[in-house]
Amino acid sequence: MDERPDPVTPPADLDVVPVDLRDYVDFSQDAAQRVRVFVTPTTALDLWCIEPRQATGVLSHPDADTTYTVLGGRSWFVTEEGEVGLDPMGALLVRRGVHHGIDNRGTDPLIVLASMSPPDDLAAGTPVGDSSAAVRPDDGGPGPVSRAMGRLLGGRRGTA
C-alpha cells in the first residue's frame, strides 16, 4: 500500500493549495482515525475515517468552532442536546466548547471532513486513535479502504 503524503503546511506565499483528500483516507479496524490534511495559523482540515460500529469518543474543542461534512457513509453526531443523523453531503456546525462525538452505526465505512478554526495542537499528519472506540471484527472481506473508495467513487465493489 502506498504511504500517505505528508500533510500540507501551505507556504505563506501561496494563495491556493490543492490537495487530493483520497490520499489521506486511513481506516483502522482498531479505532476511528483522525488524519490532519493541512493546517494554517487560523484553520485546520482533518479527515475522520470511521469503520462500522466505531465511534470517536467524546470530542470537545474549547477554543474552536468545527464544521463537519459527511463525504461517504451515514453518521450520527451525538451531543448533550441529542443526536443528528447525516447522509453524504450533510454538514453540521459544532460551536466551541460543545461536547460531541461521531458514531458510525451503519454498515458502510464513514468519511467525515472536519474544518476547525482556530486549529488544535494535533501533530500534522498523525492519525489519532481513540481507545474507547468499538472494534470491528475482521470478516475476511475487502479491506476498508477498498470498500470506502469503491462506494465513494464507484467501480467494482470488493476488489483490492
What do the predicted segments below correspond to?
Residues 41-44, 51-55, 74, 118-122:
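Short, charged/polar surface micro-motifs in flexible loops or helix N-caps
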Residues 97-98, 117:
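Short, surface-exposed secondary-structure boundary micro-motifs
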Residues 49-51, 60-77, 115:
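Short, conserved beta-strand element in jelly-roll/cupin
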Residues 57-58, 77-78, 94, 100-106:
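Short beta-strand His + acidic residue motifs that chelate non-heme Fe in jelly-roll/DSBH
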Residues 81-96:
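Short acidic-glycine-tyrosine-enriched beta hairpin
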Residues 74-76, 83, 99, 109:
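Structural motif
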Residues 108-125:
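A short hydrophobic beta-strand segment most commonly corresponding to one strand
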Residues 1-46, 57-58, 127-160:
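A short, N-terminal "cap"/entry segment at the start of jelly-roll beta-barrel domains
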